[in-house]
């Protein structure tokens, strides 16, 4: 995979109003999709899904021009996610935000300046490992049933003495 600069992945993010860059995101013009013998090779934004020890899986957003590819489930993980997240920006001054998707986390960072990670699913709030050094956690959730689930899971899992949690 190559850096995002001047790639369809960068154009995809920019089409969504996302101008920030993260070293966790890359682009590959020929990303395999499908089983052996029926594999297609498509352009994709590639995201490292990481723990403290480093990457353990990847997340692929398949693209068509500067949009998500038009087929069922154009966003797919490869590998077991466990407690990992797409760590777009490192926590700073004890602050970290969690959002469901990469685009939401990037947008939250752009709007608030709070470093954010993508959990890769509302159901994964509470599963993602948050560093003990985080004293101010922001849960950037959608305002729907999935977001309510994410908020309740996050509040239950991440509460501890010395940590403030904000649902946004």
Feature map (PLM): residue ranges:
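A residue-level signal for conserved active-site and pocket-lining positions in enzyme catalytic cores
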Residues: 13, 108, 139
